[in-house]
Amino acid sequence: GFARAWLDFSSTYQPQLLLPFQLSMGLMTLFISVGIGASLARQNGLDPVTTGLLCLMSFMLVAAPVKDGAISMQYFSGQGIFTALITAIYAAEVYAFLKRNNITIKLPPQVPTGVARSFEVLIPVLVIILTLHPLNLLLENSTGMILPEAIMSLVKPLVAASDSLPAMLLAVLVCQVLWFA
């Protein structure tokens, strides 16, 4: 009946049916990276688009290794969430610090605004690349893991511990107690 027809249909068209999932949940960390960057930019009085793109670049720098001539998307889904959080906060804070302390390239007022902005962000881009990329390379050469793998291995015990009935009961209890605080 219907179940058999659906099974045949879904197995025939599986790539097309999974496309919406892959373009949303499969790219979740890219949205998280840009969103955190834009939010932190607003808090620090910076341009949200520039900061969001800077955070996206920092995440992709450590979480998108090239394998067989293509970018691996392994950490673009749920596996890369912690890495997206950490790299976005790092990139946004580095950019805010450099901007606050006027460590940017200043061009004369005659230069068009768009060109001046692209040069303004050059030093933060260099600082982020020159800190995150060597860290990722050092980690990969010493442990065989890139940053997202290392972060996941550090968080794995916490995730495993929270995946139990006592942990869920404790979480609900804490929420209920803190609701009244």
Predicted feature descriptions by range:
Residues 1-9, 13, 17-25, 30-180:
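Signature of multi-pass transmembrane helix bundles
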